[in-house]
Amino acid sequence: MEHIEYEERVMISENDYKKVIDDLTNSGYKLEPFTIENIYFDNKDFYIDRNGMMLRIRNTSTGIHELTLKVRQSEGVLEINETVENHPQIDKCLDNKLLEFKPIITLKTTRIEIPIENYLLVIDKNEYLDVTDYDIEIEAETQQRAKEVMLELCKKYKLQYDSNYKVKSARAFERFKKGWR
């Protein structure tokens, strides 16, 4: 499946994370966190990352895996997904190093998704390498709508909007490249 994603994101502190969750709970939203494990791939020269792309396998507890390639566009991100059921060849391929692209980083996300009107509010707690960070994401039908909603949320919760936001995979790769071991 292929589609263009229109998203805006903002990094938040742990205190802001708790504040937003408390406010949404008190406003009557039923929050149901779930865990996602993303395994990001690249080669030794970081070809995928250097060319504005991201390749991952997202594991779920249901035995279904989603292979995703994201490619930056002038507006939005082209996302190509393929669902793969649990199959021993996946692990064999990774374990036997049959691919030029290797698993580089595993990132665990505890996610809350709330559909609101004509957008999706996503609240994430991310854990990778020795880092725990938090972010809020808005997915909407256009980039402009995503930004409008994000700016409204930032105003409501007194959050700092940064147009140079780095996605979690970029933050993890940056940390890895700085010599984390």
What are the functions of these language-model segments?
Residues M1-R181:
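Phosphate-end processing signature that detects enzymes handling 5′-triphosphorylated RNA
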